[in-house]
């Protein structure tokens, strides 16, 4: 039997959380180093898996590093893990951000033990979603994620943290209830929870209990809440605004990607003909999300809230790539998820650092901080320009591939029109990003901020590591797209694109 990479990657953070939970109070330094250890190991293992991943043509559509053990025989449910070209980049991204948020949290002093327990449990739950090949196991990991995110926002957040955390839970549970109904409908119709077996055969066997269209939309709405898609988006700005910085980075960087991943893996894989039939409607929602998110962003005065609404717009690009339904657009959507995770994760990290060092988040009161915080200003500018699609950054590569694929789609009537409308969102994005950078870091220097400190050595390490990855993917996107295509090609074949 081969080495169980995925079990170790998924559960090492949980092991770390359990060990930290057993500690008594007052050992903050040791707790931090343990958190580094138990997030570094999954990252190392995920990079090893990435390096030995079979990229040959024969591996197209093949789940690699599979582990399968009978779990609940009465339901034909299994502990079944595996990754393909779609999920492996998401695993590496989550493991990387898991380590980054530990460094971001280095100066956290409130209930440190509980804080890192929840942070590590959050990482395990997200990794579990991206590696599960059994729908029940997938759902369990999906639900577990709610608990640590709730506590991270409600205890270590700011502002209306209790309201935002409860709103997050209610929205997520609403989506989860619909998703569970869809999963149970699939199970009672097919007798299997195996995502590999269902992919490609779903429409042939999903007919008797309820219409396939109904199951498709039950699952789709559950995923759309998490992505989020307008009109299911209103929890996101509140959660981001009031979450601690580490929570915002994981939320934007990895957690909302679960929604896009679920749509591609489950909705498109099992219901390709339904996806084709309703693609124009869903592309309309994508364009609405892009334009609405960008337009509302222009009116924000809170630093983190502005970045949160930009995420709504960028997830619209993901939805556009998904429901253009061809191989290029789907590859672009998957790359956009990774790119957005790096870029917006970095934006939230820099926003949190700015708010922490300056003590102010109102954009009307900020300005001229580039003199006091040159490193933060440079990194924030790179992340911001990457978000609007600056060449040599991951944002440009992801948006270009997504738009090229969507514009050339022959499966969806009016795809070029939807694409052109979505490109308007990039123009609006340039407006709010450039205004944000100018407002926070340039303009008149304010005397009250003369004593503000720049990023310290540890902060510069993770800042520039993220910048390096953003530039690497931007200059050489094939490092990811060559793998992503192996997972996307079979889906595109099912869809006819």
How should each PLM-predicted stretch be described?
Residues 103-118, 245, 253, 442, ...:
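Cytoplasmic juxtamembrane regions at transmembrane-helix boundaries
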Residues 100-106, 124-136, 149-438:
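Hydrophobic transmembrane alpha-helices and their helix-loop junctions in integral membrane proteins
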Residues 29-40, 163-173, 373-378, 457-465:
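Alpha-helical transmembrane segments and their helix-start/interface "positive-inside/aromatic belt" motifs
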Residues 9-12, 92, 113-122, 308-312:
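Short hydrophobic alpha-helical membrane-embedded segments
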Residues 37-54, 172-183, 376, 380-388, ...:
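Hydrophobic alpha-helical membrane-insertion segments
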Residues 7-22, 36-49, 93-105, 122-124, ...:
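Central hydrophobic cores of alpha-helical transmembrane segments in multi-pass inner-membrane proteins
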Residues 1-5, 19-103, 107-117, 192, ...:
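Transmembrane helix-loop-helix hairpins at membrane boundaries of multipass inner-membrane proteins
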Residues 373-375, 433-497:
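Cytoplasmic/organellar membrane-interface segments at the starts of transmembrane helices
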């Amino acid at each position: 039997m081969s080495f169980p990479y995925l079990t170790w990657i998924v559960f090492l953070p949980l092991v770390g959380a359990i060990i930290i939970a057993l500690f008594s109070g007052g050992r903050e330094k040791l707790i931090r180093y343990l958190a580094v250890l138990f997030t570094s190991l999954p990252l190392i293992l995920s990079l090893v898996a990435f390096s030995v991943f079979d990229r040959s043509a024969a591996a197209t559509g093949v789940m690699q590093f599979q582990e399968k053990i009978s779990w609940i025989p009465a339901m034909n449910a299994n502990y079944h893990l595996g990754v393909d070209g779609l999920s492996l980049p998401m695993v590496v991204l989550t493991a990387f951000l898991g380590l980054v948020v530990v460094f971001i949290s280095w100066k956290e002093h409130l209930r440190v033990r509980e804080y890192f327990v929840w942070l590590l449990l959050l990482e395990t739950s997200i990794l579990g979603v991206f590696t599960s090949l059994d729908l029940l196991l997938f759902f369990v990991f999906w639900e577990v994620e709610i608990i640590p995110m709730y506590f991270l926002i409600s205890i270590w957040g700011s502002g209306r943290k209790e309201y935002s955390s409860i709103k997050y839970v209610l929205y997520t549970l609403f989506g989860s209830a619909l998703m569970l109904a869809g999963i149970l409908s699939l199970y009672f119709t097919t007798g299997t929870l195996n995502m590999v077996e269902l992919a490609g055969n779903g429409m042939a066997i999903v007919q008797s209990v309820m219409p396939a269209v109904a199951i498709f939309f039950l699952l789709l709405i559950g995923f759309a809440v998490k992505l989020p898609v307008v009109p299911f988006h209103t929890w996101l700005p509140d959660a981001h605004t009031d979450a601690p910085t580490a929570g915002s980075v994981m939320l934007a960087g990895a957690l909302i990607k679960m929604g896009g991943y679920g749509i591609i893996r489950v909705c498109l894989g099992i219901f390709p003909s339904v996806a084709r039939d309703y693609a124009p409607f869903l592309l309309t929602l994508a364009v609405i999300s892009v334009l609405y998110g960008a337009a509302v962003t222009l009116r924000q005065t809170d630093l983190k809230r502005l970045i949160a609404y930009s995420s709504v717009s960028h997830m619209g690009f993901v939805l556009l790539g998904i429901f253009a339904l061809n191989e290029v657009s789907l590859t672009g959507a998957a790359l956009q998820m990774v790119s957005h995770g790096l870029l917006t994760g970095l934006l939230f990290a820099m926003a949190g650092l700015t708010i922490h060092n300056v003590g102010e988040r109102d954009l009307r009161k900020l300005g001229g901080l580039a003199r006091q915080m040159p490193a933060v200003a440079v990194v924030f500018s790179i992340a911001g320009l990457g978000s609007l699609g600056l060449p040599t950054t991951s944002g440009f590569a992801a948006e270009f591939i997504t738009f090229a694929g969507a514009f050339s789609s022959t499966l969806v009537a009016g795809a070029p029109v939807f694409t052109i409308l979505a490109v308007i969102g990039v123009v609006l994005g340039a407006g709010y990003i450039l205004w944000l950078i100018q407002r926070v870091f340039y303009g008149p220097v304010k005397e009250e901020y003369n004593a503000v400190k720049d990023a310290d050595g540890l902060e510069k390490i993770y800042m520039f590591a993220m910048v390096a990855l953003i530039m690497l993917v931007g200059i050489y996107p094939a490092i990811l797209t060559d793998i992503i295509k192996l997972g996307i090609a079979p889906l595109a074949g099912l869809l006819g694109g």
